[in-house]
C-alpha cells in the first residue's frame, strides 16, 4: 500500500499494487510561498517519503498547540483562569503557560461548538488529536536514522473540522501552511485500514500532476 498526494487536486489517493483503490479530500499548502507574518505558508514539498509515526503533537510555535488535544481542564472562574492537567497529574495554569486567558477559551469554544463555557478537555490544538509524521529516507532503509529528520509538514485535522465532525456539520477543509489537512473521519478510515502504518511509502506529487 502507498499514499499519493496530489496537491493541485486537493486529493489523497491510496494505491495498492498498480491501482488506486480509494481517494480522499486533502488540502495542502499553496503552490508558492505565502506571506503570513506568524509563519509563512509554504508548498507541501513534492518528493517520496516514508510514514514514521502517529502521535499527539504539541509545539511552542502556536499558543493553542502548546497543550495536547484531549488534556483535562478545570475551570477556575474565581481566579479568572483555567487549569490543565500535566502528565504528572498535577495541574498548571493555561494563562501562565500559554498566555491564553479564560475569556479567550470560552469565546473559542463558543465559536467552535456554540456553547459559552470552558470545555472538559482541550479541543483547541491546531493539529487536532493526532498528527501523522513522515521523513525523507535518504539511505533507503525505511528507518529514521543517520542525519534524517522528521518533516515539519504532517497530516492532521483542525479544531474547526473536528468541531464540524462532532456536530455532524459539513466539513469545510481549508488550505494549510504546508501540512496536509484531512477530514476527521477520513483520517480514521485511512488509519484503521493501515494506510498510516510506519514504513508506508508516501509520495507528494508536483502541483501540476493529476491522478
What feature does the model see in each segment?
Residues 1-102, 205-207, 211:
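Intrinsically disordered, low-complexity
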